[in-house]
Amino acid sequence: MDKGIILLAAGGTGGHLFPAEALAHELKASGYSVHLVTDSRAERFAGRFPADEIHVVASATIGSKNPVKLARSAWKLWTGLRAARRLISRLKPMAVVGFGGYPTVPPLLAATGMGVPTIIHEQNAVMGRANKMLASRVAAIAGGFLPEGTGAFAAKTVATGNPVRPAVLEAARVPYAPAGGDAPFHLVVFGGSQGAQFFSKAVPQAVCRLDDALRRRLKVTQQARPEDREGVIASYEKLDIPAEVSPFFTDMAGRIASAQLVICRSGASTVSEVSVIGRPAILVPYPYALDHDQAANAAALAAKGGARVIAQVELSAERLANILTDAMSNPDTLAQMAAGARQTGKAGAARLLALLVEAIASGSTVAKFKETRS
């Protein structure tokens, strides 16, 4: 039985789309039709997204002080708003759910103006610019790492956690396998949607400094930008280290599950997936992130002992080599970190968010929803 349409809106990066994808699976399983509004960047993720239809609506980043660029952005947003109104009038969704990024602004503004129930999900510990614009207008705010009981919008904020995709939940079934002695050691390195250029230089340089006995144990899976890929491959070939290097892995969850150690950025989706799967991590927050949201995300995992957090400016090749040497020599410590990471993970986040969406779509309030969950 089709319960109606839920319209999801997300920016076209993995950090926005992955939690939207997880919610879409839950809503589809509950009998809803799901449509997605996004931008052209989402094309590489579209094959896995369980939407009945994907719509591209014009939007633009608002940040430039250049009057010409500002005028262009305003025109794009106005065009997107008109298109979003037409789309909502045609689909008649029961609710519109935004996951951040400027492509969510036109459909969420249109929905609030048309009286359609609205929810935003903020993945990070610090609210992003698009969600800040929308927070006062929407009926409910779901938080990945947002604190539930503080802030101007505490009354309508629910700490759902960050929904993770079915592939991540499947990978979470794989227990962590410590690798001591001469056992092979799988290192997984990735940089998220902001790219992995820093890791493309830092990690091979660090691996080069390892003792021969440690290098012989090492196997590497590493995300690298297309322009860096050949150089990274050559670095590992020179060291005779088996390595898979690619700009994008469709099966990243499974690769994380097979890792003894992960080195990565600390975007919200990344931290959530690593913690649900339960793998020890070296987190290097993206230093140019607005509001330092990645540092705040990383702190949540480090507080449970699931990760070490190191600022990029402090992570020299020599220091990273020392960290890798220590990690590969102390499997029990990594096992404890894996357990700490798993304690942080919220595997039921997608289901909880789906329940919140259903409640708001049916006309209920956040206060009533919280009462039913207490």
From Swiss-Prot:
Disulfide bonds: none annotated. SUPFAM superfamilies: UDP-Glycosyltransferase/glycogen phosphorylase. It is found in: Cell inner membrane. Keywords: Cell cycle, Cell division, Cell inner membrane, Cell membrane, Cell shape, Cell wall biogenesis/degradation, Glycosyltransferase, Membrane, Peptidoglycan synthesis, Transferase. Signal peptide: none annotated. It catalyses: di-trans,octa-cis-undecaprenyl diphospho-N-acetyl-alpha-D-muramoyl-L-alanyl-D-glutamyl-meso-2,6-diaminopimeloyl-D-alanyl-D-alanine + UDP-N-acetyl-alpha-D-glucosamine = di-trans,octa-cis-undecaprenyl diphospho-[N-acetyl-alpha-D-glucosaminyl-(1->4)]-N-acetyl-alpha-D-muramoyl-L-alanyl-D-glutamyl-meso-2,6-diaminopimeloyl-D-alanyl-D-alanine + UDP + H(+). It is a peripheral membrane protein. Its EC number is 2.4.1.227. GO terms for biological process: carbohydrate metabolic process; cell division; cell wall organization; lipid glycosylation; peptidoglycan biosynthetic process; regulation of cell shape. Pathway: Cell wall biogenesis; peptidoglycan biosynthesis. The keyword Cell division applies. One of its GO terms (cellular component) is plasma membrane. It is an enzyme of class 2 (transferase). It comes from the Bacteria. One of its GO terms (molecular function) is undecaprenyldiphospho-muramoylpentapeptide beta-N-acetylglucosaminyltransferase activity. It holds the Pfam family Glyco_transf_28. UDP-N-acetyl-alpha-D-glucosamine binds at T13, G14, G15, N124, R165, S193, Q294. Gene3D superfamilies: Glycogen Phosphorylase B. Cell wall formation. Catalyzes the transfer of a GlcNAc subunit on undecaprenyl-pyrophosphoryl-MurNAc-pentapeptide (lipid intermediate I) to form undecaprenyl-pyrophosphoryl-MurNAc-(pentapeptide)GlcNAc (lipid intermediate II). Belongs to the glycosyltransferase 28 family. MurG subfamily. NCBIfam families: murG. This is UDP-N-acetylglucosamine--N-acetylmuramyl-(pentapeptide) pyrophosphoryl-undecaprenol N-acetylglucosamine transferase.
